[in-house]
């Protein structure tokens, strides 16, 4: 394997773009903190961090395999390894299988409940790329998939999925729909041309209102989570800071343009970090 092929595999796994990994990792780590009522055991941190990174790469590979014919028509994606012919579909499938096995080995160190949930997580990861063909809001499926680690974190530590896990899960789904709609704005013109479905296409001229609506719902659910868990004022201060980030992002993505939309999308990882920090503060 030469240097060019290694670079192609690196690009296929999107390791040069860590922001989506962080968007998955922060809610998962936050769930570990909530489930542990404090800092979790280091073994959980290692297992779930590896799991997030590996499954994110698996999702990217599945997405590129599913979209290889569509990506040829989109300026932002027509240089991807599969689309440009740097790697074959067979190469991608073998890499995907290998990484999935790595993730499964990690989950074997957890309890049976979590092992069973891992199959649901894999199903969602496979389902999402194909939803763009028939489901009007594939961002909803992405939200289910990206944040499923929340359920797995609670099941691993508590062997159950309590009410607070559901509240937090739904909050992060709303958040994901909002930030991935921003991301989809960058490709909306191409999606309309080739018939790909997305929330950015569905919401049309009201897309900015819907993004703000889902941001608001995520904040509201975080407040409900804080009340349910009897969190202190630092938690609500963090929610206020998150709302300011949402407002800042609004003025960025409202300008449209690929760069503005991608930058607004990327900034959301700071919101995930803030929520993680204020969760940790609750148990110090």
Curated annotation (Swiss-Prot):
Q: What class of enzyme is it?
A: transferase
What superkingdom does the record give? Bacteria
Entry's Gene Ontology BP terms: ubiquinone biosynthetic process
Q: What is its main location?
A: membrane
Membrane topology for this entry?
Answer: Multi-pass membrane protein
Protein name (Swiss-Prot/TrEMBL): 4-hydroxybenzoate octaprenyltransferase
Species, as recorded: Francisella tularensis subsp. holarctica (strain LVS)
The gene that this protein is the product of is ubiA
Chain's role: Catalyzes the prenylation of para-hydroxybenzoate (PHB) with an all-trans polyprenyl group. Mediates the second step in the final reaction sequence of ubiquinone-8 (UQ-8) biosynthesis, which is the condensation of the polyisoprenoid side chain with PHB, generating the first membrane-bound Q intermediate 3-octaprenyl-4-hydroxybenzoate.
User: PANTHER family per the record?
Assistant: 4-HYDROXYBENZOATE POLYPRENYLTRANSFERASE, MITOCHONDRIAL, PRENYLTRANSFERASES
Entry GO terms, CC = plasma membrane
Pfam families per UniProt? UbiA
Which reaction does this chain catalyze? all-trans-octaprenyl diphosphate + 4-hydroxybenzoate = 4-hydroxy-3-(all-trans-octaprenyl)benzoate + diphosphate
Q: Which CDD domains match?
A: PT_UbiA_COQ2
**Which metal ions or organic cofactors does this protein require, according to UniProt?**
Mg(2+)
Q: Where in the cell?
A: Cell inner membrane
Q: Which pathway is this protein engaged in?
A: Cofactor biosynthesis; ubiquinone biosynthesis
The UniProt keywords, alphabetically, are: Cell inner membrane, Cell membrane, Magnesium, Membrane, Transferase, Transmembrane, Transmembrane helix, Ubiquinone biosynthesis
In short, the EC number is: 2.5.1.39
Q: Does the keyword Metal-binding apply?
A: no
Entry GO MF terms: 4-hydroxybenzoate polyprenyltransferase activity
Per the record, the similarity remark reads:
Belongs to the UbiA prenyltransferase family.
InterPro entries assigned: HB_polyprenyltransferase-like, Prenyltransferase, UbiA_prenyltransferase, UbiA_prenylTrfase_CS, UbiA_sf
- Where does the signal peptide begin and end? none
Q: Which residues cross the membrane?
A: 19-39, 42-62, 85-105, 107-127, 134-154, 165-185, 211-231, 233-253, 261-281
């Amino acid at each position: 394997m030469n240097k060019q092929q290694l670079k192609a595999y690196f690009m296929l796994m999107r390791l040069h773009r860590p922001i989506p990994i962080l968007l998955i990792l922060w809610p998962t780590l936050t769930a570990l903190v909530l489930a542990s009522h404090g800092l979790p055991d280091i073994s959980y941190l290692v297992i779930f961090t590896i799991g997030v990174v590996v499954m994110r790469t698996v999702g990217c590979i599945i997405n590129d395999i599913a979209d290889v014919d569509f990506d040829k028509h989109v300026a932002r994606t027509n240089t991807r390894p599969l689309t440009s012919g740097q790697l074959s579909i067979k190469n991608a499938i073998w890499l995907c299988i290998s990484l999935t096995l790595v993730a499964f080995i990690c989950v074997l160190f957890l309890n049976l409940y979590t092992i069973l949930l891992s199959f649901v997580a894999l199903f969602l990861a496979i389902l999402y790329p194909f939803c763009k063909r028939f489901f009007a809001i594939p961002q909803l499926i992405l939200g289910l998939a990206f944040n499923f680690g929340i359920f797995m974190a609670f099941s691993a530590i508590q062997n159950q999925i309590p009410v607070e896990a559901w509240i937090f899960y739904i909050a992060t789904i709303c958040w994901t729909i909002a930030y991935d709609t921003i991301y989809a704005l960058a490709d909306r013109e191409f999606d309309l041309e080739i018939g790909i479905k997305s929330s950015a296409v569905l919401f049309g001229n009201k897309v900015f209102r819907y993004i703000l609506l889902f941001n608001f719902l995520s904040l509201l659910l975080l407040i409900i989570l804080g009340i349910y868990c009897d969190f202190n004022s630092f938690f609500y201060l963090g929610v206020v800071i998150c709302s300011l980030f949402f407002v800042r992002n609004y003025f960025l993505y409202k300008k449209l343009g690929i760069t503005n939309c991608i930058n607004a999308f990327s900034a959301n990882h700071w919101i995930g970090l803030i929520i993680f920090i204020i969760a940790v503060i609750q148990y110090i």
